[in-house]
Amino acid sequence: MKYNSSLARRIDSNYKKMWIWSIVDVVAVVLAAVFFYLALGLYVVVESGNVSGINPNSNLSMAIIAAIFIFLTLVFFIITLVYAVKFVYNAWKTVARPDDKVTPGWRVFLMFVPVFNVIWAFFFFWEFAKRVNEQLAILNRKQEVSSFAALLYCILNLLSSFAGGLNGMDKKALMASLAEFPLVLFSAILVLGVLNIVSLCLLILWVIQAHSASIEIAETRHNMRAAEIAEGYTA
């Protein structure tokens, strides 16, 4: 779709490139895992002495290919991250206020500050959803970003970070104590996994809604300004 607003075009372009490179990154991760397990399997076979019809150097070749794909996953992840940053930066520009003490650029930067970003997420995702909905209401648009989903994502992100903080504890002592209660250990791992999956789904929902809503705002404002200018010329 062709947009009149340059800001809307930047938002849409970065959004699409972010998804394209993220898909490429996922493919690279899968291929890296496949070749890694092939290399591991061949290594086990070679070490067992059962090398009939197998090139002993095959596992080395597979390991090298796996290493290449692992490197590519890192490269693709960085590219995806760059486009994601550009996307959220431009999206935040659509709801930025003249009296804001924190600019869109700083809002994005603070999301990369360890520990602090867990709290800052509330002022990033949830605040964005509230501002977008306020702007859309003013512009009489039906598009909406779910404030509840954004808030829930921030809360789950906080809980996941807290659970991850257990890594700073004595792991051997922790695992030894939990090993006596395998059901508790399994439940803890299951809950943490579910939290991460739900958080990811909510984040994807936020991104999709933020894309549509921010473009709606950028386009509406651009068209309104264009109409005002045209009216001024004809007056």
What function would you assign to each model-found segment?
Residues M1-V30, V46-I54, N59-L60, I79-L159, ...:
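Membrane-interface extramembranous regions at the lipid-water interface
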Residues A28-F76, S147-L152, L156-C201:
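Membrane-helix interface segments in multi-pass membrane proteins
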